[in-house]
Amino acid sequence: MAPVRDPNTLSNYNEWRTKHTTADFKVDFTAKCLRGSVVLELESQTDKASKEIILDSSYVDVSAITLNSTPSQWEVRDRTGPSGSPVRVAVPNGAGKGEVVKLEIELATTDKCTALQWLTPAQTSNKKAPFMFSQCQAIHARSIFPCQDTPDVKSTYDFIIRSPHVVVASGVPVPGEPESVGEDKVYKFHQKVPIPSYLFAVASGDIASAKIGRCSSVATGPNELKASQWELEDDMDKFLDAAEKIVFPYQWGEYNVLVLPPSFPYGGMENPIFTFATPTIISGDRQNIDVIAHELAHSWSGNLVTSCSWEHFWLNEGWTVYLERRILASIHKNDSYFDFSAIIGWKHLEEAIEEFGKDHEYTKLSIKHDGIDPDDAFSSVPYEKGFHFIWSLDRLVGRENFDKFIPHYFSKWQNKSLDSFEFKDTFLEFFSAPEYSKLKDKISQIDWEGRFFNPGLPPKPEFDTTLVDGCFQLANKWKSKDFSPSPSDTSSWTGNQLLVFLNVVQDFEEPLTAEQSQNMGKIYALADSKNVELKAAYYQIAMKAKDTTSYPGVAELLGNVGRMKFVRTLFRTLNKVDRDLAVKTFQKNRDFYHPICRQLVEKDLGLGESK
């Protein structure tokens, strides 16, 4: 019997494994809950040795459980910290190895569900209909339905969702018009590729859609549809072509993007078939769609090949950032773009490590997760430190050789989960082939233990600075109080070049004066920018300059954007310069933020646990 490798699950998934899940839910906007049933088809991993099935749950109202259509003995045990409450179901006679049993669980979500956010019509752009969406990563699927909530278990899915409004889910829509049942319609989806529970996703609201590629559509509010289509349609197929050339053909059938309301807490969530995306990517300049390259890359790294626990999360994100940068360099037809993006990422990594402290457990590539909530460890570290490890292997063996390893790795592990050591074994096994004998000495010098377990920054590579040299030169000019800026300084730059410039200025030992900060905002049109990435970076400079005229703008932005990348960093800085405004701004917008975001900002501001 295989060991349980994931410390963030209470399930006995080494004794029973979910093979198929059927989620049959009514979206109740009045009660703000999902109600209905799930059927879990679990395969016995022992020969009648296990007499109970243990599932993860968190604040779920379970009303009945049947085992193979027969009422069963079951109980929901007391809550055990962030892991939630185990649901224990008796299987008195056990089951033979390989035998499949069916558990049908009747349930409703509660107001303590951490995976769902419910928006009133007033919180949507056209004010016509309510909206609901899920965010299950890392361990929030258990707050929707009892399950084996671990990335080490993968299941195929059927979704049957009844709602008065349009529904999308992480499966391919079943052909045909949704059936009408009273005021509701029944939306059906099928997911043929086995996925872990954190990729379970559902959303419902006033949603319209439009084509953006040969197998891709964008879905969003009717008011935002035209702008969202324009933002994405030029690059979607290019991204897909580039990704398929690097790895192998796309496995999921469709690739669609749901642009969510502003309170969505992440840049994107790689839910299969429908990436859930922040509206901050719709900036009217096609400058922020790197997020889509990242989420598309997850179709191979993370979704097809998955880390077996959150302790090895870097295998999902480090690989994805690497593939994202390969995709972007390919479509820009400029290898310097890879390094350019890596330079921006290095800044994010430095900030994350400074925030935790360079010796903190959470700055390691592989992190101990016993007894902790994986959300608390969330940062740029698995993304950027993971990327730097993958990139170091690429440079060590050479791009031509590494490009042969990429499809081998994803073929070997597709539809499976692995840990860091299995990745190491796969790499060493591949490069032990006679054709790579000249690399033997180089490969023998890889410090695997150090890479996995040393805290702090990894070795810094030599970056190609072609695309950032001008950014550094302009930043240096701003160190002089006599410098006279002009709009032409940045008029030919991409949004990311402007971001690099702002990041450099933000790191000045001596901050700008308030007057300089105001000039920068006006002359480079940053204060009024629709590009939230640039606006947030500028506000960091303004707050460090003690430019009090910028504080109302910061507070306004914090009431319009729920993406944690911006919300948490802006609140931390605002808290340092004007704690009263920071607390008032949070209290005013508390219900606007997603539960995950709300809880983490409360910790950042020292306001106690979320209720």
Swiss-Prot record:
Keywords recorded for this protein, A-Z: Cytoplasm, Hydrolase, Metal-binding, Metalloprotease, Nucleus, Protease, Zinc
Catalytic EC class: hydrolase
Pfam families xrefs: Leuk-A4-hydro_C, Peptidase_M1, Peptidase_M1_N
CC per GO annotation: cytosol; fungal-type vacuole lumen; multivesicular body; nucleus; NVT complex
Main location: cytoplasm
Top-level taxon in the UniProt lineage: Eukaryota
Cofactor requirements of the protein: Zn(2+)
Known EC number: 3.4.11.-, 3.3.2.10
Cofactor: how and how many bound: Binds 1 zinc ion per subunit.
Residue numbers binding a peptide: 135-137, 265-270
InterPro entries (alphabetical): Aminopeptidase_N-like_N, Aminopeptidase_N-like_N_sf, ARM-type_fold, LTA4H, LTA4H_cat, M1_LTA-4_hydro/amino_C_sf, M1_LTA4H, Peptidase_M1
GO MF terms, alphabetically ordered: aminopeptidase activity; epoxide hydrolase activity; metallopeptidase activity; zinc ion binding
Gene Ontology biological process terms from the UniProt entry: cytoplasm to vacuole targeting by the NVT pathway; lipid metabolic process; peptide catabolic process; protein catabolic process; proteolysis
Family indicated by similarity: Belongs to the peptidase M1 family.
Protein task: Aminopeptidase that preferentially cleaves di- and tripeptides. Also has low epoxide hydrolase activity (in vitro). Can hydrolyze the epoxide leukotriene LTA(4) but it forms preferentially 5,6-dihydroxy-7,9,11,14-eicosatetraenoic acid rather than the cytokine leukotriene B(4) as the product compared to the homologous mammalian enzyme (in vitro).
Entry-linked PANTHER family: LEUKOTRIENE A-4 HYDROLASE
Record protein name field: Leucine aminopeptidase 2
Species assigned in the record: Chaetomium globosum (strain ATCC 6205 / CBS 148.51 / DSM 1962 / NBRC 6347 / NRRL 1970) (Soil fungus)
